[in-house]
């Protein structure tokens, strides 16, 4: 798959975290956890498309740490998707396996913050594109702040969903329009003296 295809798929799935709250009434024939498993699978799979494109662009650099970081991100997202699939097949399951797999949702968000920082440091994406993965990664600290300010209620959920739809859509658009160009750029790693 080329980056244009990956970006298109990512853009199609990026708003599903937000859309799920509007779409749930139309899927009343599904158990609510099956519904969350369905939209979660679409959302996480779209995110995986963006990360695969970052990998193709070598956005985290060509060093071992940068390459491993994106493989870890893809692995964390795949494990998070396993929890979505469990919700689809066995709604209501609260086994230890589900709890462990479900923990990869927040862990993948936390790891995306590290990915975003690494992309900024490596400076392989030009201009504003360099900061987009960091924008996505900032979802985690924004949610921590919101939970401390507003609790785990509707306000935090709304902020999480809107932030997610905007940031992940910008990431998808960045991937869509960057094409393959960044792969050819020489690394101009930022030096902090």
Cite the ranges covered by each PLM segment.
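Hydrophobic, aromatic-enriched alpha-helical segments typical of multi-pass transmembrane helices
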Residues: 1-193
């Amino acid at each position: 798959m080329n980056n244009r295809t990956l970006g298109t798929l990512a853009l199609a799935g990026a708003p599903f975290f937000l859309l799920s709250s509007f779409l749930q009434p139309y899927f009343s024939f599904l158990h609510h956890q099956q519904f969350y498993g369905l939209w979660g699978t679409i959302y996480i799979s779209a995110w995986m498309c963006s990360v695969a494109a970052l990998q193709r662009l070598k956005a985290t650099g060509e060093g071992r740490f940068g390459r491993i970081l994106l493989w870890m991100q893809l692995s964390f997202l795949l494990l998070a998707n396993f929890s979505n699939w469990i919700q689809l097949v066995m709604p209501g399951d609260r086994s230890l396996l589900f709890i462990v797999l479900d923990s990869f949702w927040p862990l993948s968000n936390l790891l995306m913050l590290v990915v975003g920082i690494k992309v900024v440091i490596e400076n392989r994406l030009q201009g504003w594109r360099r900061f987009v993965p960091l924008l996505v990664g900032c979802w985690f600290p924004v949610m921590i702040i919101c939970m401390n300010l507003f609790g785990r209620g509707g306000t935090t959920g709304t902020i999480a969903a809107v932030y997610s739809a905007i940031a992940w859509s910008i990431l998808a658009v960045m991937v869509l329009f960057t094409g393959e160009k960044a792969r050819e750029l020489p690394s101009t790693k930022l030096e902090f003296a």
